[in-house]
Swiss-Prot record:
A GO cellular-component term linked to this record: cytoplasm
GO annotation terms (biological process): cell division; chromosome segregation; DNA transposition
Protein's name in the database: Tyrosine recombinase XerC
An example Gene Ontology molecular-function term: DNA binding
Main location: cytoplasm
Length: 310
């Protein structure tokens, strides 16, 4: 985790000369510390907030100028620059959260940012594999050595079986897996812990990998290691998925697609939405509900292809 107070450098190396800018930057860093230490936000989330707020501070350097007209003008320039609706929505959310915190801490008198309207962002339905495709994909792992093949197969099976995030898989330790109960302990966003079940295919793949692990590993605890023996990272997992997708003929498939696929297949099989929410580690049921739309679309496509009256 990034230490509190980290990253207190100036914007583009120039901010901080003006005392007003220094006050704004200090407030932004205090807010980021609050997000890390009190709210428990992830490093990646806090980096996003910091980036958006420093961008804002380059235009609105003084807390006394943190007003609704100035904020609208700042966002308006982003529109003129052709920024996406997703970027505008994220920047709006960042300044609104900062504003609420600043009011509570007496840095500004009124929460003018609360009146900002966030643009609606159209969420694309995630790419998912069909059940037959998923089976073919799991059987398409390819690697330079037998040990790497066993590792790659275990990674793919576990991602598909559990729907866990890539970052969560990278953080797995040997002690996190209960092989007898076929359960894995995952540390998710905000350091929230959850237990996820997995099936026989993943269990068999893990057993095969663990027989080979000690020949590759140079660290004691990490469940999965890279070619140099250290804990595996997200970039290496991306390469594993890319290589497998190429063999399987599954274009444009990302590691996150396996998470989408797991969730969709659970719902297709009749799993309860809240159970899937818990399994995926979503804080909001609304996030999980997007997979019900995927299942509905798949059902509609199957109907159109198979029903004589479609």
């Amino acid at each position: 985790m990034e230490p509190a107070g980290a990253g207190r450098e100036g914007w583009d190396g120039t901010m901080g000369d003006d005392p007003r800018q220094s006050q704004m930057l200090e407030a932004i860093e205090d807010f980021c510390d609050y997000l890390i230490l009190v709210v428990g936000r992830s490093d990646a989330t806090v980096r996003g907030y910091r980036s958006d707020l420093r961008h804002m501070a380059a235009t609105i350097p003084d807390l006394t100028e943190f007003t609704l007209p100035n904020l609208r003008a700042w966002l308006g320039r982003a529109v003129e620059e052709g920024k996406s609706r997703a970027t505008l929505a994220r920047r709006t959310a960042s300044v609104k959260s900062f504003s609420t915190w600043a009011v509570k801490n007496g840095l500004i008198s009124g929460d003018e940012a609360a009146r900002l309207v966030s643009p609606k962002v159209t969420r694309n339905l995630p790419r998912v594999l069909g059940e037959v495709q998923a089976g073919e994909f799991m059987g398409s792992a390819a690697a330079d050595t037998e040990d790497e093949f066993r590792r790659d197969s275990a990674i793919l099976e576990l991602l598909y079986a559990t729907g866990m995030r890539v970052s969560e898989l990278c953080g797995l330790d040997l002690g996190d897996v209960d092989h007898h109960r076929r359960m894995v302990r995952v540390l998710g966003k905000g350091d929230k812990e959850r237990m996820i079940p997995f099936g026989k295919a993943a269990a068999d793949a893990l057993e095969q990998w663990l027989e080979a692990r000690d020949r590759m590993a140079k660290v004691e605890d990490a469940m999965f290691v890279g070619v140099r023996g250290g804990r595996i990272d997200a970039r290496q997992i991306r390469r594993i998925v890319d290589r497998t997708a190429q063999v399987a003929g599954a274009d444009h498939l990302s590691p996150h697609s396996l998470r989408h696929t797991a969730a969709t297949h659970l719902l297709d099989g009749g799993a309860d939405l809240r159970q899937v929410q818990e399994m995926l580690g979503h804080s909001s049921l609304q996030t999980t509900q997007i997979y019900t739309h995927v299942s509905s679309q798949r059902l509609l496509e199957a109907f159109r292809q198979a029903h004589p009256r479609a």
